[in-house]
Regions:
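Single conserved hydrophobic/aromatic residue that forms the stacking wall/gate
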Residues: 1-11
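Twin-arginine (Tat) signal peptide motif
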Residues: 6-7, 186-189, 239-242
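Active-site-flanking structural segment that lines cofactor/substrate pockets
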Residues: 15-45
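Generic beta-sheet signal
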Residues: 46-50, 74
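Gly/Ser/Thr-rich loops at beta-strand to alpha-helix junctions
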Residues: 51-59
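Short active-site loop/helix that positions an aromatic residue
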Residues: 59-66
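Catalytic cores of enzyme domains
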Residues: 70-216
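Ferredoxin-type iron-sulfur electron-transfer modules in oxidoreductases and energy-metabolism complexes
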Residues: 153-181, 195-299
Length: 299
């Protein structure tokens, strides 16, 4: 856990002097994808240095592809990652009154006011890290010493999606209705998402009720997230930030991952952000593209 001083440091926009970098902290709880911050930073005077994990660089590449970030005004230092920790999972493992959390390889040591406890790292990492793309940075200017570029991608990326697909339509609808009913329209998922980079969001329109925070019907609960998922389809890199920041713990990444799975099956395997020049399946056409009738039959 971060000290009060460290928590204060987390909310600062940037480090502007070499001296201030002595307060820089990078540990198992630094899970934020900083690529979206470069939209604003790269428009300012001078060059900005940013530390990106392997998965973050996919989002950065996608922003480059969409002309949202000025690459010449950005200096990327690639940093290693063994999977970021989920404090909620640590608490659910029975750890209360936590005073410190330390990492020791594949073991997480948790000190509490009631005693110490050891947990397996794999059991308490963020859900997105269970589908890690591997240790390779697809964009960087310099790599830190702790990078393992040969770290392989994990398997089972679509296991949870397949479980949802196996449900009866009524059961699947009930699942999402229950999950989305907890939404408080805080917009955290939208604000953190690198693919949601519109200058003015369609939901921020005072002429319509979509700008209001509170949902008045179950349809509105579903509409916001379904439309957002459609808007980022083919551009979502599966960074998982939407689920990480959700205060209601809604597994929003599963909606986006379902789109990714379908796109892979319809148009061939595609990873958004893997490069900066290829065209996404939904903005490109080949004679091998799936026919609309097949999509309709598949459902």
């Amino acid at each position: 856990l971060l000290s009060r001083r460290q928590r204060q440091m987390c909310i600062r926009d940037s480090f502007e002097t070499a001296e201030s970098l002595s307060e820089f902290t990078y540990d198992g709880f630094c899970g934020a994808n900083l690529s979206k911050y470069m939209i604003k930073a790269s428009k300012e005077e001078g060059k900005t240095l940013v530390f990106l994990k392997p998965c973050d660089t996919y989002s950065f590449n996608q922003l480059i592809k969409e002309h949202r970030v000025d690459r010449e005004k950005t200096y990327i230092v690639g940093i290693g990652c063994d999977g970021k920790l989920d404090i909620e999972k640590i608490r659910e493992a029975g750890c209360k009154g936590i005073t410190a959390v330390t990492e020791d390889g594949d073991t997480i040591k948790v000190a509490t006011v009631y005693g110490d406890k050891e947990l397996a790292r794999e059991d308490v990492i963020l859900e997105r890290c269970k589908a890690c793309k591997g240790g390779k940075h697809v964009a960087y200017d310099e790599l830190a010493e702790n990078c393992d570029e040969e770290k392989p991608a994990k398997e089972g990326r679509f296991e949870l999606v397949e479980k949802l697909e196996a449900m009866a339509p009524e059961e699947r609808f009930a699942f999402w209705q229950n999950e989305l009913s907890r939404c408080i329209r805080c917009n955290a998922c939208r604000n953190v998402c690198p693919a949601c980079s519109c200058i003015k969001c369609v939901f921020d329109n005072d002429r319509y009720d979509t700008a209001q925070k509170a949902n008045t019907t179950t349809f509105e609960e579903q509409m916001f997230h379904i439309i957002r998922a459609f808007h980022v389809a083919g551009r979502c890199t599966d960074c998982g930030e939407c689920s990480r920041v959700c205060p209601q713990h809604i597994p929003l990444h599963l909606l986006n991952r379902k789109f990714i799975k379908d796109i892979d099956e319809f148009y061939g395997e595609y990873q958004a952000g893997a490069d900066t020049d290829s065209r996404a399946p939904l903005t490109n056409f080949t004679q091998e593209d799936v026919e609309p009738s097949i999509v309709k039959e598949r459902g």
